[in-house]
UniProtKB/Swiss-Prot annotation:
Protein name: Aquaporin PIP1-2
Organism: Musa acuminata
Keyword Transport: yes
Coiled coil: none
Tissue: Barely detectable in roots, leaves and fruits.
UniProt region (Disordered), positions on chain: 1-37
Family to which the UniProt record says this protein belongs: Belongs to the MIP/aquaporin (TC 1.A.8) family. PIP (TC 1.A.8.11) subfamily.
Positions in the Extracellular compartment: 77-89, 155-175, 231-258
Cross-referenced PROSITE patterns: MIP
Membrane topology summary: Multi-pass membrane protein
Amino acid sequence: MEGKEEDVRLGANKFTERQPIGTAAQSQDKDYKEPPPAPLFEPGELSSWSFYRAGIAEFVATFLFLYITILTVMGVVKSSTKCSTVGIQGIAWAFGGMIFALVYCTAGISGGHINPAVTFGLFLARKLSLTRALFYMVMQCLGAICGAGVVKGFQKGLYENNGGGANVVAPGYTKGDGLGAEIVGTFILVYTVFSATDAKRSARDSHVPILAPLPIGFAVFLVHLATIPITGTGINPARSLGAAIIYNKGHAWDDHWI
């Protein structure tokens, strides 16, 4: 067939190489056309089951994310010595690993946001409508609250005595330090999401969509590794809000604005 014809040529390394010719060669040089921006309001979504299914997926994913990660934090905090627990590295792996798994599971349903900051960034880029963005954010926050609530329900004493996984600026750091760490950390995450899910790369390399959860999860791991000692690592407003609401003690709200 014409689109699959190949021409044998001498490559730069002096070995023959096959290059597509004809229509196949032309298709490689075509400029990628960006899809049209999502409409600001899309009332038709409200009558679609896929819209609500996506919201449920975000709720479940954020619920599981908070449940596993806060349990990990509780296990580390209650330990008397660093050698008897997974430490900061283990917490970072729990956050990064859960994001990797949950993005992989929900990408085909909701896009695998699991984070209002990611949803807001994609909305600003006109990748989704305002209706869907608001619905996702509400479901993410509800999922986070429920996830933290289940942890408290299972181990109330341990939860309340060890900070409840709430984000606070650690002693020795200023609020400015915490704000800077959160801004940079959130930027790294959102930048990685945009790069890993870039439609132009996906069209050129078929393996990119499959591998997208890996760099996203790894970025979350690295950001947590760097900023857990500063703020406990927010970078996810739903995660911070859920832990603060369920813990609901003074210091959990003092630095919540960061």
